[in-house]
Amino acid sequence: MMKTSAIHSPFEAPNTISLVAGTGDANNPLNAFDMSLLESGIGNLNLIRISSIMPPKAAIIPLPKIPQGSLVPTAYGYQISEVKGETVAAGISVAVPKDKELCGLIMEYECIGGKKECEDTVRNMAKEGFEMRGWEIDEIISIASEHTVENIGCAFAAAALWYK
């Protein structure tokens, strides 16, 4: 049997997670994306895109006040469209294990379509991820955004990890 050793890293794992979502519409894709970040409350942070693992025992909290310019580990999904009248959506879910020694799963999804379809899909993805691991779910939380494009539109959803 393989012995597990402690993780040695210069970085401490974040101990909080916050779900946020926003939308934007602008004259170009980057500004639409930026507007969606601003609406979600994380537009003045440097997002470091991470894979979909929530550190064990991380607390799910409302977005704290994070200093501008901070490097923030973030899992996110976004959908941009330039088709006027098209509806775009993005969602994120977090599955929390019953066994608090295990990590949680963060799933992100984006689509051409509505918020309900997106949120249902991202919640099912979290369930499937736990089934693949043989773990029991304590709870799943999720958030999604939806936007009907006027010029160039973006829907965005994220899980921002931070520290207490």
Swiss-Prot record:
Cofactor note: Binds 1 pyruvoyl group covalently per subunit.
Lineage, broadest ranks: Archaea, Methanobacteriati, Methanobacteriota, Methanomada group, Methanococci
Enzyme class: lyase
Protein family per UniProt: Belongs to the PdaD family.
Transmembrane segment boundaries: none
Record-listed Pyruvic acid (Ser) modification sites: S52
Cysteine pairs bridged by disulfides in the record: none
Residues under site feature: Cleavage (non-hydrolytic): S51, S52
Name this polypeptide is given: Pyruvoyl-dependent arginine decarboxylase
Highest taxon of source: Archaea
Cofactor(s) needed: pyruvate
